[in-house]
From Swiss-Prot:
Residues 1-8 are cytoplasmic. GO terms for molecular function: heme binding; metal ion binding. The chain crosses the membrane at residues 9-29. This is Cytochrome c-type biogenesis protein CcmE. It is a single-pass type II membrane protein. Pfam families: CcmE. Heme binds at H124, Y128. The gene is ccmE. It comes from Janthinobacterium sp. (strain Marseille). The keyword Membrane applies.
Length: 155
């Protein structure tokens, strides 16, 4: 084989190896960061995977918030109007967190169907609700006037 062709072949092979490694790393990073959204009805039906990080959203049930006296541990129920799930969280809740308001909690399901949350997100203002929560509440027939609720603008 001609030395120039051999050198060119080595460069092409090195380039292909580099691109392959970069693609593998990118796909691995994306796979770890995908958090699918599930409603309480989907979680109760068993559609959400256990042990995988998911997002669950709905309305915080009135009277369901229970705090422990000696730690930051708390639990509350989230509903979509049809079903509810228990969310357990250790930490400080967002300032806008209230019973009867929309939230999205991120975490993993335990064997009992409770969400062990490591992050809780509350709505932005008195009219904002995450788009996934609006869709879930519309399907459950709970949301009475969806036009008064602002959705996050997509930019």
């Amino acid at each position: 084989m001609n030395p120039i062709r051999k050198k060119r072949l080595y460069w092409i092979l090195a380039l292909l190896c580099g691109v392959s490694i970069a693609m593998a790393l990118a796909l691995s990073a994306l796979q770890e960061n995908i958090n699918l959204f599930y409603t309480p009805s989907q979680i109760v039906a068993g559609e959400a995977p256990q042990g995988t990080r998911i997002r669950a959203g709905g309305m915080v049930e009135n009277g369901s918030l229970m705090r422990t006296q000696d730690s930051l541990a708390l639990r509350f129920s989230v509903t979509d109007g049809a079903h509810n799930i228990t969310v357990r969280y250790q930490g400080i809740l967002p300032d806008l967190f209230r019973e009867g308001q929309g939230i999205v909690a991120m975490g993993k399901l335990d064997r009992n169907g409770s969400l062990i949350a490591d992050e809780v997100l509350a709505k932005h203002d008195e009219n904002y609700m995450p788009p996934e929560v609006i869709h879930a509440l519309k399907q459950a027939g709970v949301l009475d006037n969806p036009k008064r609720v602002k959705q996050e603008s997509t930019r």
